[in-house]
Swiss-Prot record:
The keyword Disulfide bond applies. GO terms for cellular component: virion component. Disulfide bonds join 23-26. NCBIfam families: GRX_euk (TIGR02180). Keywords: Disulfide bond, Electron transport, Redox-active center, Transport, Virion. InterPro entries: GLR_AS (IPR011767), GLRX1 (IPR047185), Glutaredoxin (IPR002109), Glutaredoxin_euk/vir (IPR011899), Glutaredoxin_subgr (IPR014025), Thioredoxin-like_sf (IPR036249). It is found in: Virion. This is Glutaredoxin-1. Residues 3-106 form the Glutaredoxin domain. The keyword Cytoplasm does not apply. Induction: Expressed in the intermediate phase of the viral replicative cycle. PROSITE patterns: GLUTAREDOXIN_1 (PS00195), GLUTAREDOXIN_2 (PS51354). One of its GO terms (molecular function) is glutathione disulfide oxidoreductase activity.
Amino acid sequence: MAEEFVQQRLANNKVTIFVKFTCPFCRNALDILNKFSFKRGAYEIVDIKEFKPENELRDYFEQITGGRTVPRIFFGKTSIGGYSDLLEIDNMDALGDILLSIGVLRTC
């Protein structure tokens, strides 16, 4: 069930972030991503509260990404990790280029 929940959200080539809105690391990751202007439908925020039991979802995250914590961030079906991974990419000034290369940003 967790696999289906996650894979349905990763079906399109987009940026998907699984969060808990009470988590400060999730809010920080959203702040980084919200600096960019995404094409319609190219960015999805998924509150993990939508899935019960949450532990099953976290177990699946661990199976496919190596981590149970949120945020879990995907570019297409590829996990880039969590907040610290996103922050590292952003601090290298590479995030915008990556997002452009996968075609999720507005270019005008």
